[in-house]
Amino acid sequence: MWWLAALFYFVFICFSESRASLLATTVSVLVILYDNKRIRNVLLSRKVLVVSIPLILLLLYLIYRFKANSANGRLLIWRVSFDMFKEKLLFGFGPGGFLAHYMDYQANYLSDHPDSPFLLLADNVNNPFNEYILVLVNYGIVGFCCLMASIVAVFKRLLLLDEEKRIILSSCTVVLLVVSFFSYPFSNPFVWVVSTVIIMIVLFESTGKKSGLLAIPISVCSVTGIIISVLSFLPEREWQVISQRSLMGETETVLPDFRRLHERMKNNGSFLYNFGAELHYSGYFEESLQILEECSSYLNDYDVQMLLADCHQNLGDTLTAIDCYNYASRMVPSKFLPQYQIMNLYLAYGDTVNAVNAANAILAKDVKVSRSKAVQRIINEAESLVKDVMFHSR
């Protein structure tokens, strides 16, 4: 029955098209097999190694080729993240540092490498798709070494458990560690719960009679964690409710609720962006600009820059609006809208030369995917402007 269940699970993973899950499952199975001494000796034999190493390399290549653009996009993220890591080696940017600064570094990297093959793959990014890189960027070498020391300590304790518990907990831990190389499982609260349960079981089971000494500090930490989670969940839940009401057409009604929540969630970039967007939608451009500038300290991406640009545009600050549109275009060069807005701003002020420059920038872009109607309309307008200017200049 176990083998049948495992087969169904493997088929499910394949159909889910999750490369990280497939790789994690494969490694987890190898860990389970490796725990058996007889199987371990077979796996480590020269004949098996000679055959298995090329197969493993082939598997990794096939996993890469399965979604090559997605994989290359992650390579770009990791490359830019390395630039961030070099900037603050020891202690990193602090909690939320990646989210606050990554897009600035991506904009600089792509500006410095205009012929990069990654240009069309660049997009809005809020996570490096690698928990280890996230730790390096946010907490530097010191934080990363603490993480590695904790992982090693857990595995040392795992080896002290009886065979059945050791196999189950080791395979679960390995799955989490492997998936963390290619995704962001720890953004899910459930994964934190599972990880905490694994650590507590390992600590209590491996210490035997000494486990009573660990009960008090672990219980205190667990209760403290639960209290902090609940306290942070309450405003999140209230925010979710008023956001839903806003989507149902009650934006003006819920703006006072957003303002009230602002004091409690002023360090949450996603909340600040949502609040700024609601103010922008309702026409409160000055207040929206203020909130979005706060937001850029915690979350600064293409969408934030586009909203900032539109606020400046509506407040009559054309030059700053153009700067924001240009910065948004540098962040995600494949987007057509920033240069389109710049083209229209210059046209509105009678600056035909710069309007044509923006139009040519639009026409020079490669299309990331098949053209949507909106993109095709932008291209048509840019072509029409260039043709009109060329015709009248004769």
Where are these regions (language model features)?
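Hydrophobic alpha-helical segments of polytopic membrane proteins
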Residues: 1-61, 197-205, 215-220
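Transmembrane alpha-helices of multi-pass inner-membrane enzymes
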Residues: 24-32, 164-215
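Hydrophobic transmembrane alpha-helices and their immediate junctions
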Residues: 46, 141-168, 324, 337
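Hydrophobic alpha-helical transmembrane segments in integral membrane proteins
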Residues: 62-76, 215, 219-253, 270
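Canonical tetratricopeptide repeat
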Residues: 274, 307, 341, 375-378
